[in-house]
């Protein structure tokens, strides 16, 4: 079977979920200048064709720097914000204007090679961002540098309803006709909040947020962000992370940080279960909970391969339905990726931990330990003092977690009578 067939099958729930959703996408000036920009444009057009309501916010910092260099003007910054005097503002207007036109042209040019071939893709921009001056901070007059006051929510939604892609530049206008240079991150964050967007997607040079060992941090809650900001200092990843958290605190369900240098990063983030970047979200991305009858199908998908390998005892659908209240599960984006069951043993203060299973793709994230802790807590609440486990293949895993070798003679009679000598499982016990 071709690989793309399998990919489409896995992506189909996301295609359906994203239809008619509002996404605000922020692409910094470095991203527009990157060789992968053409692929990003194509992916944006694909999203539009799938029914996503798109607001694209572009940056322009390197393009402004180039204009300043051409005129021999030295850039001035304070706290990583540009001080925009009159001469600098002229360069900003020039760079932003040319870049906006270039993006519009690129979106139009890619139509022949996009899913929108044969239809009219409309890109619209305008004076929908109202701004105000930052003013004087710490004795520094920022002059024409501003901050977003509001975006025209009704106007933008009207355009999105009419199937326009809305393009926002890092310029804002005051009611008195002044022009202000804005940070594209600020524009994107405020647009996402004011539009009650479903997602804010932030492009950066890196794959996403990396930890101290250089590993990708896939998910974060807004309350976890400050610790990472302190570690990152004042680099651009910190700016993106701060913007993502601010959007979530403002009501945006999910914010994503992805790489503009990686071909397909946007689609990977949106149409695969684990994505390819960093997700910041208020709600729990992965949930440990008690199983419900609706989980039986997912449980069977998880444990059947392990039953076929002889690792787990076979359980029919009827058995699972009857014993579903004994199970705890780990759910990730609607998929059951791990499970465990607790069976109290009659006429004893003992219980059996059974059917502990983790999807092979998720076996290195501590989910087995998480389920074990949940089962132990549940057992204590039921007055169980000794937990037994029978296993044929994972003895060392349980030994490392405090289980001691045991025997059939140690099992309560109600469980010992059911012991399968042909299977010859090793028995372990743990006082809890």
From Swiss-Prot:
CDD domains: AAK_NAGS-ABP, NAT_SF. This is Amino-acid acetyltransferase. GO terms for biological process: L-arginine biosynthetic process. Keywords: Acyltransferase, Amino-acid biosynthesis, Arginine biosynthesis, Cytoplasm, Transferase. It is found in: Cytoplasm. The lineage of its organism: Bacteria, Pseudomonadati, Pseudomonadota, Gammaproteobacteria, Pseudomonadales. Pathway: Amino-acid biosynthesis; L-arginine biosynthesis; N(2)-acetyl-L-ornithine from L-glutamate: step 1/4. GO terms for cellular component: cytoplasm. Residues 286-425 form the N-acetyltransferase domain. It catalyses: L-glutamate + acetyl-CoA = N-acetyl-L-glutamate + CoA + H(+). It comes from the Bacteria. Belongs to the acetyltransferase family. ArgA subfamily. It comes from Pseudomonas syringae pv. tomato (strain ATCC BAA-871 / DC3000). It is an enzyme of class 2 (transferase). Its main location: cytoplasm. Pfam families: AA_kinase, Acetyltransf_7. One of its GO terms (molecular function) is L-glutamate N-acetyltransferase activity. Its EC number is 2.3.1.1. The keyword Lyase does not apply. Coiled coil: none annotated.
